[in-house]
Amino acid sequence: MSEICHRSNTRPVRVGNLTIGGSNELFIQSMCTTKTHDVEATVAEILRLEEAGCQIVRVAVPDERAADAIAEIKKRIHIPLVADIHFDYRLALKAIENGIDKVRINPGNIGRKEKVEAVVNAAKAKGIPIRIGVNAGSLERHILEKYGYPTADGMVESALHHIKILEDLDFHDIIVSMKASDVNLAIEAYEKAAKAFNYPLHLGITESGTLFAGTVKSAAGLGAILSKGIGNTLRISLSADPVEEIKVARELLKSFGLASNMATLISCPTCGRIEIDLISIANEVEEYISKLNVPLKVAVLGCAVNGPGEAREADIGIAGARGEGLLFMKGKTVRKVPEETMVEELKKEIDKLAAEMEEKRAAEEVQKANA
């Protein structure tokens, strides 16, 4: 292919109760930091991730204890579980046997053809997809010898090599990732991959860093990739609590209009005109709307003179003034409220609008089901 395969045209692949690919929908993924064999700790972390908005979660499976824990973990969580396997095909077989929803393994790295075939047959029997994880830092020796150093072309060649192994065994439930720590390399690799095949792509900038630096780096790289219509799932990799990865991912998707079930906050950068503690109010409102599953736009602005007009695209908002606030909807002032109660008044209106949106969505789903 010479053209980029847009995410909506990728091959649909089932992962648990989700369909990855074949639509414009992206799913947010994270990875547990716990030892997988510690079921209690792993389940507790996954439940926190679920609450934050994680839709797929990966766990490391370095040994048999981890593989054995999968069945119990699956019973206690509500999102698809992915097993991260390196080299040992027996761990992949055990993970599949114990009900894993997807396996991340590079077929070229697990040995003889019979081993690959065993994993593929087990995955086929249970409808389990395989994610091929290409990483610039661990390309095959023959590719590094050919290109001299990690390149986008080398990464695509590696992906095609692993894809061919699976396709030769008539296996096509494939997802591919093309991760690199270098932002420009990752952008180029994903773009070339989207031109080379139509399998769904999992996005990530690997080893991106700590919470602040990693957020900036991931947003820069993944934002460029998303803007090209590439990507079906994504993970923000941070050296931080994995819940922070979900928060960043949600904001990134909202920035590109790719989140149909998340609320958005609009707030001004503050200036000498403000008469309220806008920063703390904005943080409070942002936290309040973070659990909403509707596309509500909320504004918190410091200036009652320009505020409502500047945020007319917001569904609801407040603009501060001396001793009072203006509550507005779609740029039009609804009423004045005392400063000490304006946040609570805003929250009440948010709850009303969110409930209306939920009711409307439910009615549309019923209508769609009956059509």
Curated annotation (Swiss-Prot):
A Pfam cross-reference name: GcpE
Keyword Transmembrane belongs to the record: no
Pathway(s) annotated for this protein in UniProt: Isoprenoid biosynthesis; isopentenyl diphosphate biosynthesis via DXP pathway; isopentenyl diphosphate from 1-deoxy-D-xylulose 5-phosphate: step 5/6
Binding site for [4Fe-4S] cluster: 268, 271, 303, 310
Cofactor(s) the protein requires to work: [4Fe-4S] cluster
Details of cofactor binding: Binds 1 [4Fe-4S] cluster.
KW Metal-binding (keyword) present: yes
One GO process term, biological-process aspect: terpenoid biosynthetic process
Coiled coil regions, renumbered to chain: none
Listed EC numbers: 1.17.7.3
One MF annotation (Gene Ontology) recorded for this entry: 4-hydroxy-3-methylbut-2-enyl-diphosphate synthase activity (flavodoxin)
Superkingdom, taxonomy of origin: Bacteria
Reaction it catalyzes: (2E)-4-hydroxy-3-methylbut-2-enyl diphosphate + oxidized [flavodoxin] + H2O + 2 H(+) = 2-C-methyl-D-erythritol 2,4-cyclic diphosphate + reduced [flavodoxin]
Entry-linked InterPro entries: Dihydropteroate_synth-like_sf (IPR011005), IspG_bac (IPR016425), IspG_bac-typ (IPR004588), NO2/SO3_Rdtase_4Fe4S_sf (IPR045854)
Keywords: 4Fe-4S, Iron, Iron-sulfur, Isoprene biosynthesis, Metal-binding, Oxidoreductase
Function: Converts 2C-methyl-D-erythritol 2,4-cyclodiphosphate (ME-2,4cPP) into 1-hydroxy-2-methyl-2-(E)-butenyl 4-diphosphate.
Cross-referenced NCBIfam families: ispG_gcpE (TIGR00612), PRK00366.1 (NF001540)
Protein family membership: Belongs to the IspG family.
Name of the protein in its database record: 4-hydroxy-3-methylbut-2-en-1-yl diphosphate synthase (flavodoxin)
Species: Lysinibacillus sphaericus (strain C3-41)
Classification of source organism: Bacteria, Bacillati, Bacillota, Bacilli, Bacillales
